[in-house]
Amino acid sequence: MGRPPCCDKIGVKKGPWTPEEDIILVSYIQEHGPGNWRSVPTHTGLRRCSKSCRLRWTNYLRPGIKRGNFTEHEEKMILHLQALLGNRWAAIASYLPERTDNDIKNYWNTHLKKKLKKMNDSCDSTINNGLDNKDFSISNKNTTSHQSSNSSKGQWERRLQTDINMAKQALCDALSIDKPQNPTNFSIPDLGYGPSSSSSSTTTTTTTTRNTNPYPSGVYASSAENIARLLQNFMKDTPKTSVPLPVAATEMAITTAASSPSTTEGDGEGIDHSLFSFNSIDEAEEKPKLIDHDINGLITQGSLSLFEKWLFDEQSHDMIINNMSLEGQEVLF
C-alpha cells in the first residue's frame, strides 16, 4: 500500500494558508535558508507538514516568482518541454525559474492543451488537403502520361508495321524471278522442204508493253536500225576471242540482210528462211577461215562508221552476195 501521506497525521492542519502562517515561514527561511524541510514545522511551530511548507515556499512565497500571463516564448518552451518530458512539471519549471510548476501545470491544462489540439487539427487538415491535391496532380499526370504513351505506342506500332510491310515487299522483290518487261511472241517459219515452204515462210513479231530496254531480248525485225544496234552491242560486250560457228553464221546472215536493202520481196523471204536453215550453219563450218576473218575484222573496228565502210566494200559485198545466192539455191532444192 505504501506509506500514508504526512498530512493524514493527527494534529496536522489542512487547507489554505493564512497570512500569519506565510509571515512565519518567510521569516524562518530568510534566517536559515531553504532546505531541511522536515525541521521547519518543529522550529517554527506551524501545524503544517514539511511537504506543505516546501510547496508553499516554492510556488508562492519565494522571491522572483513571475505572475500574470505567459509570453509566447514561454508557451513555446512549455510545449517543447512537455513533448520531451511529459507531465513532469517540476522538471519543466526548472527551465523556467520565474514560473512555478503549479502555474505551468494549471496553464497547460487550461490553455495550452486546447491550443495544441487546434494546431494539430489545422495541420492535419492542411496536410490532408496537400496530399489530396498532390494525389490529384499525380493522377492527372499519370493519366496524361498514360495517354501520351498509348498514342506514342500506337504511332510506333503503325510505323513498325509499315516498316515490316516495306521490308517484306523489298524481300519479295529481291527474291522474285525477273520477268521480261517486253514479252515477245514470234513464230519461226516452217523448215519444210516442200515447194510451198518458201512461199509460206513468215516471221511474225509482236511486241507488247512499253519498251524500257534499249536492246530488248527477242528476234529483231530485218531493219538496218535494229541490226546496227545489235552490232554495236556486240562490239561493246564481246571479248576479243573466236566466235562460235553458229553465232558467226547468224551474224553473217544479219549483215547480208543489212547490205542488200534493194532486194525484192522474194529474195527477202529467202534470206529470212536462210537465217533458220541448217544449210547455212553447215556452209559456215565449211568456211571457218572466211568467217573468222570477217568476225575479227568486225571486232577490231572501233566504231560503227568504220564497220559500215567495211560492210559496203566492193570485194566483201561480192563475196557475201555469192555465198547467199548459193545458200538460197540449196534451201530451194
From Swiss-Prot:
GO terms for biological process: positive regulation of DNA-templated transcription; positive regulation of wax biosynthetic process; regulation of DNA-templated transcription; response to water deprivation. GO terms for cellular component: nucleus. Residues 9-65, 66-116 form the HTH myb-type domain. Residues 134-154 have a biased composition (Polar residues). Expressed in germinating seeds, rosette and cauline leaves, flower buds, open flowers, stems and developing siliques. Residues 196-209 have a biased composition (Low complexity). Transcription activator involved in the activation of cuticular wax biosynthesis under drought stress. Binds directly to the promoters of genes involved in cuticular wax biosynthesis. Transactivates WSD1, KCS2/DAISY, CER1, CER2, FAR3 and ECR genes. Functions together with MYB96 in the activation of cuticular wax biosynthesis. This is Transcription factor MYB94. It comes from Arabidopsis thaliana. The lineage of its organism: Eukaryota, Viridiplantae, Streptophyta, Embryophyta, Tracheophyta. The gene is MYB94.
